[in-house]
Structures are given as C-alpha cells and as structure tokens.
Amino acid sequence: MARVAGIDLPKNKRIDVALEYIYGIGKRNAKDVIAKANGQIDPTTRVKDLTEAQANLLNTILQKEYKVEGELRREISGNIQRYVDTGSYRGNRHRKRLPVRGQRTKTNSRTRKGKRRTVGSKTK
C-alpha cells in the first residue's frame, strides 16, 4: 500500500482514481498531478505496482503545488472562523448552523438543521 500525502491509497485501484482519496484532490487534479509527473507514471498503473521513486515523485508534486489534507482543512476552517469573528451575515449563519448561501429554510435544509425537533404548544 503506497502512502502519499499521509494517506494510504487503496492498492488495487488505478493511480488516477486512488489519488481522489486524498482530501482536496478530485478527478481533474488527479489527472493534472499525473501529467506533471512528465510521463514517469502511467494513469492506468495500479497503486500496488508503483515503485518507491514514483510514490516519492507524487509526494513532492503534491507538497509543492497543492494544498491537501490538514493544510486545506485548516485553511477552510480559518476562513469560516474569520466570517464568524467579523460578525458577517455568513458568519452568523455558520454560527447558527443554518444554510449559508441563501437556501430556503421553511422546508428542507435538514442536513444543516439536523433531525426534526417538534415544537409543540402547551395546553392551558
């Protein structure tokens, strides 16, 4: 199992698919990383068939040119925290755990709001 950017890649998958297991790398970036390897890595190569040199090459490309995993997560959470600290509308929506980008909340938005809680009326 090859370890790239601190992640164990699944050994039976092709390298272009396996790179998508790294947070911050999608289909497009995975193909770009392989292209930047200057033909040293074939996209159809399985992870188990990668040599140590090829794995190191992937590591160096990812470290130099991409923000992935912890670094990317820290940047995103820092951006959200900046909105919250400035007291902006987006920050308040994040603080209240409501949709940030203008979606309706009378119905839907269950992902952000969580499981339904009944707000019943009290009998007199």
UniProtKB/Swiss-Prot annotation:
Gene Ontology cellular-component terms listed: cytosol; small ribosomal subunit
Pfam families: Ribosomal_S13
MF terms in GO: rRNA binding; structural constituent of ribosome; tRNA binding
SUPFAM superfamilies with a match to the protein in the record: S13-like H2TH domain
Keywords assigned: Ribonucleoprotein, Ribosomal protein, RNA-binding, rRNA-binding, tRNA-binding
Xref: InterPro entries: Rbsml_uS13_C, Ribosomal_uS13, Ribosomal_uS13-like_H2TH, Ribosomal_uS13_bac-type
Function per UniProt: Located at the top of the head of the 30S subunit, it contacts several helices of the 16S rRNA. In the 70S ribosome it contacts the 23S rRNA (bridge B1a) and protein L5 of the 50S subunit (bridge B1b), connecting the 2 subunits; these bridges are implicated in subunit movement. Contacts the tRNAs in the A and P-sites.
Protein name per its UniProtKB record: Small ribosomal subunit protein uS13
Source species of the chain: Elusimicrobium minutum (strain Pei191)
Name of the gene: rpsM
